[in-house]
């Protein structure tokens, strides 16, 4: 499916607008088992440098999550996004996660980003501290390429899973990951959410970009890479 780069909001709800664009079934009683696409694993010793920057990540909400990305005003309707939280009785300015894009002190994260050979590409350390919640939504990356099939979003889990940490894709709960595990999902269609009810921060690297032929070659087989 080819999506246009731009679209207009059809409602005052980001969630309802996203549902109208998606081909997901939205049947909560149908048990999803195939929403998470496992790509392989990075190995290496990044824990010390990760710990040195985890406190540097800036708390973000729906309104400021794109600051410094160059996509601040693209496919964004903060009012509709915040309306979903208000309707649910939540604080529309609540912290949804903490973001860090400066990898000067954690060069391994830059090597992970570069490994996938995407162009253009951006990445950020996406950390949730205890009590932080990113409510159900569907991503809006249509501005990156005229054909959404060329746009890839990859998650690298940076520390072992702790009970109370979860990512939800569709209605499939993703947990029990190990440090270095890599996955992706069908971002134009799959609703997802993340939360941390554990007693430790949950860091992951989110890499987003346009695939090249080299990227497709890398994804053609399971990843086993020391970084």
Language-model segment annotations:
Residues 29, 143-145, 196:
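Short, flexible, solvent-exposed loop/turn segments with mixed acidic/basic and small polar residues
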Residues 109-186:
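Catalytic core of non-heme Fe(II) oxygenases with the double-stranded beta-helix
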Residues 2-119:
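Non-heme Fe(II)/2-oxoglutarate
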Residues 34-37, 120, 151-153, 204:
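Intrinsic-disorder/low-complexity, polar/charged segments enriched in Ser/Thr/Lys/Arg/Asp/Glu/Gln
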Residues 160-227:
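Catalytic core of Fe(II)/2-oxoglutarate
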């Amino acid at each position: 499916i080819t999506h246009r780069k731009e679209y207009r909001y059809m409602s005052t709800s980001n969630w309802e607008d996203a549902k109208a664009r998606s081909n997901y079934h939205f049947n909560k009683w149908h048990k999803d088992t195939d929403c998470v696409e496992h790509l392989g694993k990075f190995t290496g010793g990044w824990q010390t440098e990760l710990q040195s920057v985890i406190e540097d990540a800036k708390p973000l909400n729906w309104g400021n999550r794109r600051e410094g990305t160059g996509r601040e005003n693209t496919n964004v309707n903060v009012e509709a996004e915040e309306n979903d939280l208000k309707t649910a009785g939540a604080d529309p300015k609540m912290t949804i996660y903490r973001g860090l894009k400066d990898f000067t002190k954690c060069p391994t994260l830059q090597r992970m980003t570069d490994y996938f050979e995407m162009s253009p590409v951006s990445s950020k350390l996406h950390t949730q501290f205890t009590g932080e919640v990113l409510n159900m939504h569907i991503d809006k990356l249509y501005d990156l390429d005229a054909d959404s099939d060329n746009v890839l979003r990859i998650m690298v889990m940076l520390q072992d899973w702790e009970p109370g940490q979860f990512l939800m894709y569709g209605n499939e709960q993703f947990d029990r990951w190990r440090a270095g595990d890599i996955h992706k999902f069908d971002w134009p269609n799959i609703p997802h959410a993340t939360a941390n009810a554990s007693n430790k921060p949950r860091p992951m690297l989110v890499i987003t970009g346009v695939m090249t032929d080299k990227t497709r070659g890398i994804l053609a087989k399971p990843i086993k890479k020391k970084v």
